Amino acid sequence: MTRVLFAAAEAAPFYKTGGLGDVSMALPRALQAEGIETRVVIPYYPHQMPTEYQQQLVPVTHFTVQVGEHAMYCGIKTLTVAHVQYYLIDNLDYFGREGLYGYWDDGARFAFFQMAVCEMMEQIDYIPDILQLNDWHTAFIPVLLAEKYYWIEAYRDIKTVLTIHNLQFQGVYDPIILDSLFRIGTETYTEAGVAFYDQVNWLKGGINFADAVNTVSPTYAQEIQTPAFGERLDGVLRANRYKLSGILNGIDMQLYDPATDLALTANYSAKDLKPKRQNKRALQRRLGLPVKNMPVLAVVSRLTKQKGIDLLLDALNPFLQQQDVQLIVLGTGDPALERALRTYQSAYPQKVVAAIQFDTQLAQQIYAASDIFLMPSAFEPCGLSQMMAMHYGTLPIVHAVGGLRDTVIPYNRYTGQGTGFSFDDYQPAVLRKIMILAVTLYRQHPLVWRQLQHQAMTCDFGWEHSAQQYRATYQKLMR
């Protein structure tokens, strides 16, 4: 049986800040279901971990990890959830904080984590066939295996797979860290290694040293090889394209199922969509909007420019003046964008609700209650929200990039095919035009709309497909 150790900086259900947390929960479970023994290693953030899981933790061992001149305590705890065994790396100095990221010493924190992962394998006698790494927090591990731990015989056959969930975050530090944190020489500090504009780039090191690299959608894998999306690593990615692929993320089809979702006022399915309207009325009442059967548009997102919130704001004013619609926005993020959304709520109190908060239950109610889901991201490695919206029969409007292009089939008025709407030209007027098209179709052609809902709801976005592609990647490396 293939053995995989899945290393990440976060994992639901313990803690998550975004899509990485969802993937770190769902993909290991899906790999297990495919017959691949998969264990997960993450940091132990005691302040974030729910008590029910804290109480299940069992100590395994402890040792010290040399971070520069400092011998740092490293405790290993374990628990099993949904048939997946998790190892948690414990060091209060580094991980006993209120948040997960964004600290001045993140370099030291995740240098420690990566060395702890490498040393833990021998300490607990779990030597995987595949080390599945995720984003910059674990991207330097292939470099460490080649330069620091090369003498450990048991590690020689380990293959490394690096998954890039978002190329924007790379782990870029002063070259001094090679010695001051990792205690390795400067042999890798070259263009073909880890050097990046007079800095050390962990993600670049991972791309160059890993046995395989993938991103979380086929389109994003192509896009990041261009200057427009490559975040200054497009040349490195083109040089490594022989080992680069795109594997689409999935969603938990059981968890996000309108037929069984306990957060909803009324459950419904692709066969019986009528109760969906009850969810709309309940949400309108809850949020203080007029209870009317009008088109409800929704955003559930981090409020950032990457997610296209600035584009949406620029498109909104004429749209709201001319159209009898309601808009519900749920999320937190850039304070300037939060303020702008609140301003719209003040200007259009009968039409706009800006819920500046993080609330998963409310999010699921919004997916169920709304008619149109807005996701005009500037770039989108994969995106999960558009898949959730479709599964709830809420048709997405997306910018045709990355995973949005791979998951949403644009409506074709001639054939009736489609699961949503998309636009290419990233302009407020273009977004506004497609919003008007969607709202008009909803109002004037209810039978066409219902057919699109049915097509969206019956798409299979389950993790099984993704897990099979990861399995194929692993098998290819192990030949």
From Swiss-Prot:
Keywords: Glycogen biosynthesis, Glycosyltransferase, Transferase. InterPro entries: Glyco_trans_1, GS/SS, Starch_synth_cat_dom. One of its GO terms (molecular function) is alpha-1,4-glucan glucosyltransferase (ADP-glucose donor) activity. GO terms for biological process: glycogen biosynthetic process. Its EC number is 2.4.1.21. It catalyses: [(1->4)-alpha-D-glucosyl](n) + ADP-alpha-D-glucose = [(1->4)-alpha-D-glucosyl](n+1) + ADP + H(+). This is Glycogen synthase. SUPFAM superfamilies: UDP-Glycosyltransferase/glycogen phosphorylase (SSF53756). Synthesizes alpha-1,4-glucan chains using ADP-glucose. CDD domains: GT5_Glycogen_synthase_DULL1-like (cd03791). The keyword Glycosyltransferase applies. It is an enzyme of class 2 (transferase). It holds the Pfam family Glycos_transf_1. Belongs to the glycosyltransferase 1 family. Bacterial/plant glycogen synthase subfamily. Pathway: Glycan biosynthesis; glycogen biosynthesis. ADP-alpha-D-glucose binds at residue 16. The lineage of its organism: Bacteria, Bacillati, Bacillota, Bacilli, Lactobacillales.
